[in-house]
């Protein structure tokens, strides 16, 4: 039956989770087409690989398709979805298509509210360094291969497992990681945090009897579900003394981290001296998760150490543009990051302060979704108030309708009441560049954050100026 599927169409193919799957399928020999209203680097790359890309949503786009793949961002009234259902063309959720890829490999699925993309990239890099030639599908562009995805010849596939719509329950990996559990996408779980935790347990229980769950013992909510898990478990952490894989002697070195990784699993014990080419304690935890996976798969220590030391990074994950000089000779350090949850913002700001101690931190943030802003409003106010200067643009709706008192102006008012900083509200994102140039002082660190259209701002900030030095680690 499967051989009848030759042409697969993706609705919203430019999305990070969609483009990676499409690329793997192209490399497997499938004919791929897709639609996306806004072209981006993903659609351009797919076109170069042979995909047919449409920049409209229209019924005729799926004319010869044997299956249509959709993400949860695609609404039921999309004309391509309507046409597919009318013609009885299978409409396949993105996670179900990802599950098909896992069925053909030994699947490693990285789950958690934060850190999925970086951890997935670290695991893929460790396997590649060990000569395992893994397939991977990542939510960001891995710089070493200039892609979200790659079809390898080895037995392993490494993927992100998305809890935002509970679609990770489609996946049946042999090894899984849970980095943390935090309040996000709570409408999926009817605003019941216990239901969210229970869904993670259900995800872990999809492992086969010989499978392994790698769980972060430092995260209180992950620790809370460990007694509910019947599968084999390896724990990791920094502060948890009972973790089987621990980091000690952690040192910041500009945009790198040094630490000792103590591995005590199955009665054996050894220590690795690690240099991680990423900043921040949160990335030390991500590296420990990757080490735990490598240890379970018997990856040589030398390969793990080298992969972490030479890790090339992921687009928009503490992506450094170096020192930028303005025409009036003021210079500042520019960093771009995808983080959009208060916990992610706090961790990234801490990493920036440790990497560039004593320098003023200017945060430029675009909130993502009205519902997230409403649900985490007080956390946003607290975290955003800790910047030295704040530029806040209007919310990127991601298709949501506005919610009263859950917009950027409301955040600005609440932050102003705190009295710590005077936030600057920028209504139109195309005004951000000039606003940054106005606010920035000599020696500042400018941190751009958000998951929406703000991703286009950092390249524009760097373009017309003179790069002094590019800091790579």
Swiss-Prot record:
Disulfide bonds: none
Listed Pfam families: Mur_ligase, Mur_ligase_C, Mur_ligase_M
Gene Ontology MF term list: ATP binding; UDP-N-acetylmuramate-L-alanine ligase activity
Main location: cytoplasm
Record keywords, A-Z: ATP-binding, Cell cycle, Cell division, Cell shape, Cell wall biogenesis/degradation, Cytoplasm, Ligase, Nucleotide-binding, Peptidoglycan synthesis
Pathway in which this enzyme or protein is active: Cell wall biogenesis; peptidoglycan biosynthesis
Enzyme class: ligase
Any GO BP annotation: cell division
Gene3D superfamilies: Mur ligase, C-terminal domain, Mur-like, catalytic domain, NAD(P)-binding Rossmann-like Domain
Catalytic activity: UDP-N-acetyl-alpha-D-muramate + L-alanine + ATP = UDP-N-acetyl-alpha-D-muramoyl-L-alanine + ADP + phosphate + H(+)
InterPro entries noted in UniProt: Mur-like_cat_sf, Mur_ligase_C, Mur_ligase_C_dom_sf, Mur_ligase_cen, Mur_ligase_N, MurCDEF_pg_biosynth, UDP-N-AcMur_Ala_ligase_MurC
EC number, as in UniProt: 6.3.2.8
Top-level taxon in the UniProt lineage: Bacteria
Residue numbers binding ATP: 112-118
PANTHER family registered for this protein in UniProt: UDP-N-ACETYLMURAMATE--L-ALANINE LIGASE, UDP-N-ACETYLMURAMATE--L-ALANINE LIGASE-RELATED
Membership in a protein family: Belongs to the MurCDEF family.
NCBIfam families reported for this sequence: murC
Protein name as catalogued: UDP-N-acetylmuramate--L-alanine ligase
Source organism: Nitrosomonas eutropha (strain DSM 101675 / C91 / Nm57)
Lineage per the UniProt record: Bacteria, Pseudomonadati, Pseudomonadota, Betaproteobacteria, Nitrosomonadales
Name of the gene encoding the protein in the UniProt record: murC
